[in-house]
Amino acid sequence: MSTLPEAKLDVLLAHHAALEAQLMAQVGAEDYVRITRELSELNPLVEAVKSYRQVRDELGEIDELLEDPATEPEMRAMAEAERDALDAHRDELIQQIRIALLPKDAMDERNVMLEIRAGTGGDEASLFAGDLFRMYEKFAALQGWSVEVISASEGTVGGYKEIIAEVKGRGAFAKLKFESGVHRVQRVPDTETQGRIHTSAATVAVLPEVEDVDVDIKQDDLRIETMRAQGAGGQHVNKTESAIRITHLPTGIVVMMQDSRSQHKNRASAMNILRSRIYDAEQQRLDAARSAERKAKVGSGDRSERIRTYNFPQGRVTDHRINLTLYKLPQVIAGEALGELIDALTTEHQAAQLAEQGNAA
């Protein structure tokens, strides 16, 4: 049986009680919002801790009863059955508390920059990129999030060669961060007359939306160019230089934005994307340096890693990182069953974190 850090739990309960006391006092509107939000985050853990301690005390009483030689056989049998049930409940509570105490990703509550790019497979890859975007769009709607397209380059027969969107909602990065990587589709294209299955792919990048304080970008490190926006055939589509291209010289990261007629809006959007990409590149560098450690985690987050296959003829979706197959492809593509994959990935990630803590102990 795993043990819990009782001293840490005492501090947690004391902090929770102090927050409740603050809430009863006269506090300003800003403090009220902050305190109620923190309490809502702590409440499930606090309830689990209280339940765990109650179960622990009840088990202690049962053990005393069982150790008493005067306890009658019928009472002893009832006590042993109750102890077995309480043992199982205690183990569940311990696991729940240990998971809740895991270090939180500082970016988990952030909005997301979602980038989807068609890969190998030509037109079919563009169509698949469109399918993936709609899947995330529908999933976001089910979570109560909003999705705003920042930039889109449409495919010749539909879908997207590339699409960048901002997903706004509490916990968006926590839910979507394991979606980064290569998604592969196997299906018969509408244009295929022989019924042959084609394989194509699209790359998904999920980046947390970062702020100026998260990434230090010096103005001297930027090369900013303005130009006239161009259409699909290369022709200029307006007479003003509203398009923006920003190059971050130290990393070589380039962001081009021309979707708005406003140069100011294009520049703001480009800077938002640039900040997210620079932050992500630094995280990728740090992760590579800890590659041995990350072998125990859910995938590497490597953009070139094939993470999932969508097989339309068989109606299945397979996530290769956790060897999970769901025969619910229509529901996954509709965003309805995507949560099952995300929850399984999160559980696996938490299990790996717990194992690492155990090894470090």
UniProtKB/Swiss-Prot annotation:
Pfam families: PCRF, RF-1. It comes from the Bacteria. One of its GO terms (molecular function) is translation release factor activity, codon specific. The modification N5-methylglutamine is found at Q235. Coiled coil: none annotated. Its main location: cytoplasm. GO terms for cellular component: cytoplasm. It is found in: Cytoplasm. Methylated by PrmC. Methylation increases the termination efficiency of RF1. Keywords: Cytoplasm, Methylation, Protein biosynthesis. HAMAP family: Rel_fac_1. Belongs to the prokaryotic/mitochondrial release factor family. Peptide chain release factor 1 directs the termination of translation in response to the peptide chain termination codons UAG and UAA. This is Peptide chain release factor 1.
